[in-house]
UniProtKB/Swiss-Prot annotation:
GO cellular component, as recorded: endoplasmic reticulum membrane; lipid droplet; mitochondrial outer membrane
Reactions performed catalytically: a 3beta-hydroxysteroid + NADP(+) = a 3-oxosteroid + NADPH + H(+)
Active site (catalytic residues): S182, Y205, K209
Highest taxon, organism lineage: Eukaryota
Family: Belongs to the short-chain dehydrogenases/reductases (SDR) family. ERG27 subfamily.
Binding site for NADP(+): L20, T43, K49, Y205, K209, S241
Protein name: 3-keto-steroid reductase
GO terms of molecular function: 3-beta-hydroxysteroid 3-dehydrogenase (NADP+) activity
The enzyme's E.C. designation: 1.1.1.270
PANTHER family: 3-KETO-STEROID REDUCTASE ERG27, DEHYDROGENASE
Keyword Magnesium: no
Top-tier EC class: oxidoreductase
Pfam families (UniProt xref): adh_short (PF00106)
Length: 346
């Protein structure tokens, strides 16, 4: 195990097997000083995915980077829609690590049921740029609950990761950085304060990302003042996502890709397409000196050259959201107080 010293860093990336997650790992290794000793904590719901992503990151480091520092891997088998699994992750981290330097909250679970192709055709023909930037034709199931009786998307993308942070603040204190991945689609219209767990929403994924925005603005100042933890909110733009491939065939996939490139060519800065470009804002916030009071966005120009932009966020209701999440944390602390679990069981 790498010794804990000034030249060692520990990074935890949730959803590491996703296109964004693995590219966060690639960029982090590339942008840290080459002599830095790095421990990457890879997360997935399954052991085969963990093994695959570790192999890919290790191969990338050996073939693409000229690193002199050590690279070690650890893993968590964690399902954020299962509170016992989240608690298990906490126990494992607490047992093995004295500090975590970077936590990338890359939770992006949806309950998609497919694509409304008729609506997609109409939307793209009517306004091609809007149709591939803010699509409304991806259909989502309504009312899906987890086995913990919470809104599944709410738990996966918001409360599950929030509860893990609640438990491991002592590992992040005095300099740790938390990077929450938001979305281009986190518009206030997608969230009702009468439905915070998104059980009635036909746009639960987008609503969960609006909750992430509000949660950040309701908590980042307190994390900084009480624990010395810096929290950032980022938006990766539009890029190819592994999770949506199952709804596309070869023709529709390449048609989508062509539309993405055309949108970028005609001036859309949000169509990064590449997961590596999408990872620019998360890694820059982890290593740089960005503002915590705006959303930091990965964007690119017509030729694909990356840069950052900054988005002001409507923070109305942020205090209410943070209070609600803290209340849930207290309730689950009581529920789980006698629970003992083992995260190493695949």
């Amino acid at each position: 195990m790498i010794k804990d010293n000034d030249n060692s860093k520990v990074a935890l990336i949730t959803g590491t097997s996703s296109n964004l997650g693995i590219n966060i790992a690639y960029r982090l290794l590339e942008q840290l000083p080459s002599s830095t000793n790095v421990t990457l904590i890879v997360t997935s719901r399954t052991l085969p995915k963990v093994k695959e992503v570790i192999t890919n990151i290790n191969q990338y480091s050996k073939t693409k980077l000229n690193r002199t520092g050590q690279l070690e891997f650890d893993y968590l088998l964690v399902d954020f829609t299962d509170m016992v699994s989240v608690l298990s992750a906490y126990y494992d981290l607490n047992k093995k690590f004295k500090k975590i330097d970077y936590l990338f909250v890359n939770a992006a679970q949806g309950v998609y049921s497919g694509i409304d192709w008729v609506a997609a055709t109409k939307e793209i023909c009517r306004n091609p740029m809007e149709g591939v930037t803010n699509p409304t034709y991806k259909t989502q199931r309504v009312g899906v609950k987890s086995n913990d009786n919470m809104g599944l998307v709410f738990q996966a993308n918001v409360f599950g990761p929030y509860y893990l942070i609640h438990k491991i603040k002592h590992l992040l204190q005095k300099g740790g950085r938390i990077i929450w991945i938001s979305s281009l689609m986190s518009n206030p219209k997608y969230l009702s304060f009468n439905d915070l767990q998104l059980l009635k929403s036909p746009e639960s994924y987008e609503g969960s990302k609006r909750l992430v925005d509000l949660m950040h603005f309701g908590t980042f100042k307190q994390l900084q003042s009480e624990y010395g933890i810096e929290q950032y909110l980022v938006q990766p733009g539009i890029f190819t996502s592994f999770s949506f491939f199952k709804f596309l065939n070869v023709f529709t996939y390449y048609s989508m890709l062509m539309l993405f490139y055309l949108a970028r060519l005609f001036g859309s800065p949000s169509h990064n397409i590449s997961g590596f470009i999408a990872a620019n804002a998360p890694v820059t916030c982890a290593l740089g000196n960005e503002s915590q009071s705006v959303k930091v966005c990965s964007v690119s120009n017509r030729t694909g050259k990356e840069y950052l932009s900054y988005q002001e966020v409507d923070t109305t209701g942020s205090a209410d959201i943070s209070a609600y999440l803290e209340k849930l944390c207290h309730e689950w602390d009581l529920t789980l107080k006698d629970q003992i679990v083992n995260t190493r069981q695949p």
